Regions:
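Conserved pre-motif I regulatory segment
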Residues: 1-29
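Conserved Walker A/P-loop ATP-binding site and its immediately adjacent core
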Residues: 34-47, 52-74, 273-276
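Inter-Walker segment of RecA-like/P-loop motor cores
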Residues: 70-108
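SF2 helicase catalytic motif II
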Residues: 106-151, 155
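Interdomain helical connector at the RecA1-RecA2 junction of SF1/SF2 helicase-like NTPases
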Residues: 161-262
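Long, largely alpha-helical accessory region at the distal end of helicase-like NTP-driven motors
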Residues: 238-240, 244-247, 251, 255, ...
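Conserved helicase motor "Helicase C" RecA-like lobe of SF1/SF2 P-loop NTPases
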Residues: 273-296
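Conserved RecA-like P-loop NTPase helicase motor core
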Residues: 291-395
Length: 463
């Protein structure tokens, strides 16, 4: 099957096989959407055919990624990867490692195991004193026991600056050493990934009104950035503003229309802040006649909803804490980023959901985001595969902890498809002067914010 591999995948496999002749640990950084899972499966096949391993055990950050790994590896290896009798191996989540029995870990002592770790940056484990629970499992159970390991990541750094399990860092600089690197620029040039187009939405006349008992005062800000710097308004407040939300969604809908004229099954992703926010987004899409699905970290049978969306004609999927890294929905080509999470790791992983290229006509990916200063900075350097300030390991003293996963205690939205009439106007104008209370639990509101009809769009052509 190697004849159907991409050039970078063949080069990486060859590099790994040569590397394994001297050392058992191989670290691969490849841009999201490049095809890391397929490469890993083909590498496992090569090791099996060479008689160097007996079992393949894979670990991944989520159930969605586990399912994808199991499917891809089974297809490539021609054997089951379900952990049952007769299988060549198994796949489990990092969280599931903590619940594995001693019989599972004895496999590393009794067999030659090839251990594959997807999105390894979730596992802090460079220093035993600073490792999280998942990193400790790798350090104690796998690192010295596995015949070979393959660590994969598209974004090999952590938001807490701790070192990554199975990673090597230069001394004294503390710079991450990758055994193989395949960046976004290369992937776009090789027509493996779509070229990202990031649209930053801004407004040149934002009014903030402070209402007092007997008086009120109004300030006008020339941009979202100045509003956030010079007022009590937070980024989270803006995400819930109906006018701004509708404007951003409108841009996404318009772009999806253009894309579907060329690629009829193309779809869009909206990353929402929490479950209530997802409900607000869903209502806005319904008002425009858009078909949609909602999937959250509280949705029953969430994986089934995602799987059905993959092969459906539904235009949008609204997600909270579900569709980020590793989730493979190739028809996603447009994304509206409305998450409250502002870390570069999360931002790049979300962008990666629309980068996977499937043909000759889907060469562009579109991301729409508010012109918030931090997100604008992230956008400007998307083409930098390993940002200088994130590539350095610094010494930090923090307690061991698990994965930083956004949680939400609200009641889950039912998994429904938008039922708005297709005859309604999907491009209706937005209420550009709608007001937002900054004190959601108090009445009457103290501050109100409104946006003029004069929105600005900045298009970033990344690579």
């Amino acid at each position: 099957m190697r004849s159907s591999l991409r050039a970078w995948q063949r080069r990486c496999i060859d590099a790994a096989l040569e590397h394994y002749s001297a050392t058992p640990h191989f670290f691969c950084q490849a841009t999201p959407g490049a095809g890391k899972t397929r490469m890993a499966a083909e590498l496992a096949l090569a090791l099996l055919q060479q008689g160097k391993i007996d079992l393949v055990l894979c670990f991944a950050p989520s159930c969605q990624v586990v399912d994808g790994f199991r499917t891809t590896f089974s297809q490539v290896l021609g054997q089951r990867l379900d952990g049952l009798i007769g299988a060549v191996g198994d796949v489990c989540t990092y969280q599931g490692m903590e619940h594995r029995t001693e019989a599972f870990w004895k496999l590393f002592d009794e067999y030659r195991v090839f251990a594959v770790f997807d999105e390894i940056h979730h596992c802090a484990g460079h220093d035993p004193l600073l490792s999280n629970a998942w990193g400790q499992q790798i350090l104690q159970r796998v690192q010295d026991q596995a015949a070979f390991t393959l660590a994969l990541s598209g974004t090999p750094w952590r938001s807490d600056d701790r070192g990554i399990a199975l990673a090597r860092y230069s001394n004294p600089e503390g710079r991450l050493i990758c055994d193989y690197r395949y960046g976004l620029r290369e992937a776009v040039a090789d027509e493996v990934c779509r070229s990202p187009r990031i649209v930053l939405l801004d407004n040149h006349k934002v009014k903030l009104t402070e209402e007092l008992e007997n008086d009120s005062s109004t300030q006008v800000f020339p941009s979202i950035a100045t509003l956030l710097r010079g007022s009590p308004v937070s980024y989270e407040d803006l995400l819930c503003h109906d006018g701004l939300l509708n404007q951003l969604l409108g841009l996404g809908i318009e772009k999806l229309d253009e894309v579907r004229a060329i690629k009829p099954d193309a779809a869009g992703l909206v990353v929402a802040t929490n479950i209530e926010h997802a409900r607000q987004v869903a209502l806005a899409l319904a008002a425009r006649g858009e078909s949609y699905r909602v999937v959250t970290n509280r949705t029953p049978d969430a994986q089934q909803v995602i799987n059905e969306f993959k092969s459906s004609d539904c235009r949008w999927i609204v997600a909270v804490g579900m569709i980020s890294e590793g989730t493979d929905i190739p028809r996603l080509q447009v994304c509206c980023y409305l998450s409250r999470i502002r870390t570069e790791l999360h931002y790049r992983q979300v962008l990666g959901r629309v980068l996977r290229r499937t043909g000759s006509t889907d060469n562009l990916a579109w991301l729409f985001v508010l012109a918030e200063p931090t997100l604008e900075e992230f956008s400007q350097r998307v083409a930098d595969d390993l940002p200088e300030d994130l590539a350095i390991l610094t010494q930090v003293q923090v307690p061991a902890m698990g994965l930083e996963t956004p949680t939400d205690d609200m009641t889950a939205i039912s998994q429904v498809e938008g039922l708005a009439s297709k005859d309604s106007d999907r491009h209706a104008g937005t209420n550009v002067e709608s007001a937002l209370s900054l004190s959601c639990l108090e009445a009457p509101p103290i501050y109100q914010i409104s946006f003029s009809q004069h929105y600005r769009q900045q298009l970033l052509v990344v690579c």
